[in-house]
Structures are given as structure tokens and as C-alpha cells.
Regions:
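Short, positively charged patches
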Residues: 1-129, 133-140
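Glycine-biased, small-residue-rich flexible motifs in mid-sequence functional cores and linkers
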Residues: 3, 80-398
Length: 398
């Protein structure tokens, strides 16, 4: 606990994504020893400039106590860079986080195969279904799935893992209790029962634009390989790929080939330039590793049940009708499926939709549910192949 106080103090003074935390672990027996040495010792270390030393001298140690108290209140765990529990794969990069804040239980990432599944927030339905399906199958093979908790590909990969009863790690670019992407709050809560939501930023830290590139180095470091599902030419996913290759030039990069359009420019270019291996099946990823121990006794041939995702492409095959549109007589009585094991709110939303497009505001009016509660339900229903977004924020039965 003492080391935790000093490492939190260090991050409040120096910041995040710095090489200096790791360098201190080699120079001193403990961070406490460094702190107690005072300004003269900080200068002698040769690591800090005058501005940084001035900042350290002004930041009181008890600033850490408030953050630790918040962690205790919310039952968050913490792991310091010099703790035995700190992942070796994360320590091995140049700029590992001084502190990890954890909701849930961080799996033994060093001894378990892990794959990061990443892609655009504005994913197509093909990208959403593919990320869900690949994460589901990899999880069934015992692979830990790592992603960033964002909308689109990230969210779908986490949901696919949860559907497979697998283990997933969600790495955030803000404090883990910050109300960021409220529509994904339930997903993040569910992850903590089968994995962990983690961040290098203390609780209550607001997301900043530069946090997400910093966050990406953690995703890549924790992963044995990176799977890019759908990425444009300027996608943040490419930052994660570059980070992975800077950390380890032999890191395995995979990509799912997509249509020749701007949404897949980045993914396709990775394949074309031989930066990434093209995959069509989760086994392509498993087979690429010669010396990785996959901890599983699960049936890797198991497919997602029809009740869960009856139109999701199995083993990477695209849907028969990639646009997903079917022809219906709009005067036809909606044929809602039965026995879908939906929650009451999910049923309410599902039965508010028919073959003619229904706007989300109308769904809210019919169900008496706020839009922010409807959005994650809509995502679930889309992933299960029950509905489709056809225009704007309007939805119809499939």
C-alpha cells in the first residue's frame, strides 16, 4: 500500500505514458526510497528536468490517499509497476503504466494466449458481426480477448466474448468509474465478472483525446497478436498496430479483408503491404502461434446458437446478403420470434419494431424507455440478427 501511495503521487506529478517510471524501478530499491530522497536525490537520478522536479516538490503525497479511498469505496484493485502481479508483457515495453486500476480480476495474461480485436467505432454491420463472431470463436478456444470498450468493433468483440462465457479485458482511456459511453455501462459491468475493466488513469479521470493513443499501447502490450476487423485509412486501430510493432517487431498482426471502400482502406492496406496476415477463420489465428499455450478444454467447434446470432457469419464467411435487406410486404403482420430469452426491456423494444422502419424516438415513445437505455438493446438485437438499421436511427425486423 505504501508503494501505491508513492506511485500515484509520481503519476500526478509526472503524468502517464512515460519511460521514467520503469527507469526508477532499476535505479532504486523502492519508489518510497526515491520519494524520501527529496529534490537532491531527484536531481541526482538524472531523469528529470527542472520543471518536473518543481512539480514533484509541489504535489503533496496525500493526494494519493484520496484516490486510494475512491478505489476502496468502489472495490477497485490496483497493481503497481513493481508488484509481483504486474504483467511482465506490460512491464517489457518502454513506457509501462506506473499503476493499473482494475475493476474485476485481471487474468494471468502472461501465461494465457490473448488477442486484441480492434476496429472502427463506426463499423458496418459486416464489421460488427465479424468482430462478434471472431471473438466468440477465439474465446471458445480459450483465448483472452482484449479491446477498448468503444462503440462498433470494440463493443462487438467484448459482447461476443461474453456470449461465449469467455474472458475479456477492456482497456479504457478514462477513469474506470467515469460515465463514458453510458450505453456500454452494462457491458462493462458484465466484463468484470469474467475478466477486467482496466485503466492507467485514476477513478473520475475524464477522457481526453490524447488518452486513447496512450491507451492503445496497453492494448497492444497485453496482446500476443492484433486482429484488425474494419479500419479506415486514418483509423486509431492503425496506431495500435504501429504501437505493437514498435514494442515487438515480431508481434503478429492479422486483418479481415473487407470490401474495396473507405471503411476498409486501412485493413486492406495492412494486408496488401504484408504488415498483416489475412484471416478468414479463427483457426488462422490459433495456428499462427507455435509456442503459445492455450488454456482450454472447451469444444472449439461449437458455434454460437441460432437463438443468439442466427445471421452472424460463421468462421468469417460473409452473410449471404451482405446488405442484409429482405423484401417484405409492409402490410404483413410482423412475425416476431418467440422464446428468445430476452429481458423485459429487450422484449419491449423488440415488439415495438415491425417490418416498416421505426425511428428510435418512436420506440422510446412506445416503450416509455429513454433513448440511452434503448441503444444497447438495439445493438444486442442487431447482433442477434433480429433487426436492422435501415436509415438514420430507424430500425426494422429482418
Amino acid at each position: 500500500m505504501n508503494n501505491l501511495r508513492y506511485w500515484i503521487w509520481f503519476t500526478q506529478a509526472i503524468g502517464y505514458c512515460t519511460t521514467k517510471a520503469k527507469q526508477l524501478t532499476f535505479l532504486y530499491n523502492s519508489i518510497e526510497e526515491f520519494y524520501l530522497g527529496g529534490e537532491s536525490e531527484w536531481r541526482l537520478s538524472g531523469l528529470f528536468n527542472n520543471k518536473e522536479i518543481e512539480k514533484m516538490s509541489k504535489i503533496p503525497l496525500d493526494i494519493s490517499d484520496e484516490i486510494i479511498g475512491k478505489c476502496i469505496t468502489y472495490f477497485y484493485d490496483t497493481v503497481c509497476i513493481d508488484s509481483p502481479e504486474y504483467p511482465k508483457c506490460l512491464f517489457d515495453i518502454d513506457d509501462p503504466p506506473a499503476v493499473l486500476y482494475i475493476s474485476g480480476a485481471l487474468p494471468d495474461i502472461d501465461d494465457r494466449m490473448s488477442i486484441a480485436v480492434i476496429g472502427t467505432r463506426k463499423a458496418s454491420m459486416y464489421g460488427i458481426k465479424s468482430s462478434y463472431n471472431m471473438a466468440y470463436q477465439l474465446s471458445k478456444a480459450g483465448v483472452t480477448i482484449i479491446s477498448g470498450g468503444a462503440l462498433g468493433v470494440d463493443c462487438s468483440s467484448h459482447l461476443g466474448t461474453l456470449a461465449a462465457d469467455g474472458v475479456t479485458i477492456c482497456v479504457l482511456g478514462c477513469g474506470i468509474n467515469y460515465d463514458y459511453l453510458r450505453e456500454n455501462a452494462k457491458m462493462r459491468s458484465d466484463i468484470t465478472f469474467k475478466g477486467a475493466v482496466i485503466s492507467e488513469y485514476p477513478p473520475d479521470t475524464e477522457p481526453k483525446s490524447y488518452h486513447f493513443p496512450q491507451r492503445n499501447r496497453i492494448i497492444s502490450a497485453l496482446s500476443d497478436g492484433i486482429l484488425v476487423i474494419e479500419a479506415g485509412s486514418r483509423s486509431g486501430s492503425l496506431i495500435t498496430v504501429n504501437s505493437a510493432l514498435e514494442q515487438d517487431a515480431s508481434k503478429k498482426i492479422f486483418a479481415l479483408a473487407g470490401p474495396v471502400d473507405s471503411h476498409f482502406d486501412g485493413s486492406n492496406k495492412l494486408i496488401k503491404n504484408k504488415v498483416a496476415t489475412m484471416v478468414t477463420d479463427y483457426k488462422d489465428i490459433i495456428d499462427a502461434f507455435d509456442n503459445v499455450y492455450v488454456t482450454t478444454e472447451l469444444d472449439v467447434s461449437a458455434q454460437p446458437s441460432d437463438d443468439v446470432i442466427d445471421v452472424i457469419p460463421i468462421k468469417g464467411k460473409p452473410p449471404e446478403n451482405i446488405n442484409g435487406l429482405k423484401t417484405y410486404d409492409l402490410s404483413e403482420v410482423p412475425q416476431h420470434k418467440e422464446n428468445l430469452n430476452l429481458s423485459e426491456d429487450e422484449k419491449s423494444v423488440y415488439y415495438a419494431i415491425n417490418y416498416e422502419p421505426v425511428h428510435i424516438d418512436k420506440i422510446s415513445e412506445i416503450t416509455n424507455l429513454p433513448v440511452f437505455k434503448i441503444l444497447p438493446i438495439i445493438t444486442t438485437l442487431e447482433l442477434r440478427g433480429l433487426i436492422k438499421c435501415v436509415q438514420g436511427r430507424s430500425y426494422r425486423l429482418i
